[in-house]
């Protein structure tokens, strides 16, 4: 028997419900107003009063309206058919909704229950299985989608029977499992899982041991992201956060991409809707949309669903990780999620923290980021969820609570600088403010030594030192004037500019320069570093400036040339000759 209740108070989208039975924390309920039912979540229980946040506009709701509690938390449906879909924060399929605007109380099926899938069994009768063990697989787009023992089945089971190869609907019984007490359990292709609960169906969670290539030079070369790692991109408005995220989503070496548009402008999401079905994935040759799931909760959608959208994205990511896949989850922007938490906290009259954010903001963000990671599955395979979020600090202030809390949880920090954005140095990742703690991991060092070059991390730090010294020299030149400092200061500054223009800047709108493979990055970086380590004899600062400007121009043309093409090799020879003429 479901618990019911009546509306007893309304504070914007927080509704106080007088319940006639037991109600659980985070339980889902439906609030009725007329013929419309709106989904809501219990966020606080005091006696027989349940405080629920409604995921829709509460306009027209009145005291005494009926409320039905469902007896379960907010859940996502996990089944074949998730890829290429566009969802809202509550996993309603946006394509199935009519009209320009989403009507209040709209609910659609997240997957097609009538579609048939070609099933191939992987388990056989007599096998011992546990939660997340693979029973079979179906082909979803080009990904082999594993049919697993549901995550909710926590005991050990014996396979009694598995369906034969053939076409089935997701609701058909795929296997029958017997538990230790002899009871049979039927398993279909579809399962549900609460979004706020991490999927822990794995045997081990080792530290990341390899990097995830993104094709973005300032990330891969200077501050690499690890596969199964966490990172975030803070930056003021207009600094290029969204373009950088789109570039990473197009080029990242991942099997599945989940993009969560959390409180962002709708036109940016529409851009993805239009672009991704047309763009080709360089790793597979298929369209990008075939490996992408978009969870869209734009700024004009209900604020309460923003929190749900990031959890929905992460849960779907954990589901695909359990299939042994590399998943990249990106949220744009987690600041909007934190603002939604602030609104809820204020309406509940909780004690405010800094800037009125909840006192436990740091714990909430840390718990969420901890769900990402590399895991060893029950079958011995590995899967990973890499999480990359953006933060939009008010006024570009990187000391505000959301940035500070995220900094504690994320291992990579890609600070976008307003100064670099204003001078059109894109991507505007500040080379001195940004960092990747993965460079300190011995496992990552070994991987880089083996797959790129021995002592690669030392070369990266050498490049950062050149950039740092160049900035210091530039400060001196600005204070004392061009003639007021030795020519060595100008040389130091221009060497840092060479690294900046050739390695740290990249054209996201050029077909060749947008995606730079690691092999090419290594060759270009070694070449630039070799020049920076050379001694030059310049007569004056103007000669130094002219030489490096010419050199930067040749390198820029090289960046726009096909890798190892005649044009590319031609520029390389020109650069070598140009440098040898000027060397001491």
Residue ranges and their predicted role:
Residues 43-49, 80-91, 142-166, 184-199:
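Short, compositionally biased
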Residues 14-18, 50-56, 113-124, 158-162, ...:
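Short alpha-helix capping/helix-loop boundary micro-motifs
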Residues 19, 33, 70-71, 90, ...:
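Conserved "cap/hinge" positions at secondary-structure junctions
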Residues 221-222, 228-551, 564:
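P-loop NTPase catalytic core
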Residues 1-103:
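N-terminal accessory targeting/assembly segments
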Residues 97-152, 169-229, 244-247, 282-299, ...:
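P-loop NTPase nucleotide-binding/switch module
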Residues 539-584:
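C-terminal amphipathic alpha-helical interaction region
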Residues 15-16, 38-39, 50, 60-61, ...:
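Short beta-strands and strand-coil junctions in structured, solvent-facing domains, enriched
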């Amino acid at each position: 028997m479901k618990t019911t209740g009546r509306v007893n108070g309304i504070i914007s989208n927080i509704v106080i419900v007088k319940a006639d039975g037991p109600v659980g924390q985070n339980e889902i309920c439906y609030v009725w107003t007329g013929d419309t039912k709106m989904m809501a979540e219990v966020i606080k229980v005091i006696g027989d009063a349940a405080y629920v946040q409604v995921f829709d506009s509460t306009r027209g709701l009145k005291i005494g309206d009926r409320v039905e509690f469902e007896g379960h938390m907010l859940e996502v449906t996990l089944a074949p058919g998730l890829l290429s879909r566009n969802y809202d924060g509550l996993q309603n399929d946006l394509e199935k909704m009519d009209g320009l605007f989403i009507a209040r109380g709209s609910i659609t099926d997240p997957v097609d229950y009538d579609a048939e899938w070609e099933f191939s069994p992987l388990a056989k009768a007599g096998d011992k299985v546990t939660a997340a063990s693979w029973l079979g697989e179906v082909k979803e787009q080009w990904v082999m989608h594993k049919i697993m023992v549901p995550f909710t089945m926590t005991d050990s089971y014996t396979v009694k029977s598995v369906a034969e190869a053939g076409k089935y609907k997701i609701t058909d019984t795929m296997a029958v499992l017997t538990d230790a007490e002899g009871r049979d359990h039927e398993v279909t292709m579809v399962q549900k899982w609460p979004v706020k609960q991490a999927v822990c169906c794995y045997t081990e969670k080792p530290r990341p041991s390899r990097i995830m290539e993104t094709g973005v030079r300032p990330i891969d070369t200077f501050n690499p992201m690890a596969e199964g790692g966490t990172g975030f991109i803070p930056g003021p408005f207009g600094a290029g956060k969204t373009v950088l995220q789109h570039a990473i989503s197009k080029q990242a070496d991942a099997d599945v991409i989940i993009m969560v548009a959390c409180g962002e402008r709708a036109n940016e999401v529409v851009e993805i809707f239009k672009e991704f079905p047309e763009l080709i994935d360089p790793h597979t040759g298929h369209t990008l949309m075939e490996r992408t799931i978009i969870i869209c909760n734009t700024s004009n959608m209900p604020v309460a669903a923003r929190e749900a959208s990031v959890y929905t994205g992460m849960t779907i990511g954990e589901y695909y990780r359990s299939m042994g896949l590399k998943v990249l989850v990106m949220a744009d922007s987690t600041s909007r999620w934190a603002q939604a938490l602030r609104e809820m906290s204020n309406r509940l009259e909780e004690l405010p923290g800094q800037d009125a954010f909840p006192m436990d903001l740091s714990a909430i963000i840390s718990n969420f980021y901890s769900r990402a990671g590399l895991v060893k599955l029950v079958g011995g395979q590995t899967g990973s969820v890499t999480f990359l979020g953006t933060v939009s600090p008010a006024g570009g202030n990187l000391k505000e609570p959301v940035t500070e809390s995220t900094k504690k949880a994320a291992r990579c920090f890609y600070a976008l600088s307003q100064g670099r954005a204003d001078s059109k140095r894109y991507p505007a990742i500040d080379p001195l403010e940004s960092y990747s703690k993965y460079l300190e991991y011995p496992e990552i060092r070994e991987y880089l030594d083996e797959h790129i070059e021995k002592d690669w991390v030392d070369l990266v730090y050498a490049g950062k030192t050149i950039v740092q010294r160049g900035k210091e020299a530039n400060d001196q030149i600005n204070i004392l004037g061009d003639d007021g400092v030795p020519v060595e200061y100008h040389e130091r500054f221009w060497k840092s500019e060479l690294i900046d223009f050739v390695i740290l800047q990249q054209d996201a709108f050029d077909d060749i320069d947008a995606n730079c493979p690691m092999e090419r990055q290594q060759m270009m970086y070694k070449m630039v570093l070799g020049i920076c380590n050379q001694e030059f004899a310049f007569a004056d600062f103007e000669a130094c400036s002219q030489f490096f400007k010419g050199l930067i121009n040749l390198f820029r043309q090289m960046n726009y040339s096909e890798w190892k093409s005649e044009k590319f090799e031609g520029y390389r020879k020109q650069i070598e000759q140009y440098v040898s003429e000027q060397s001491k």
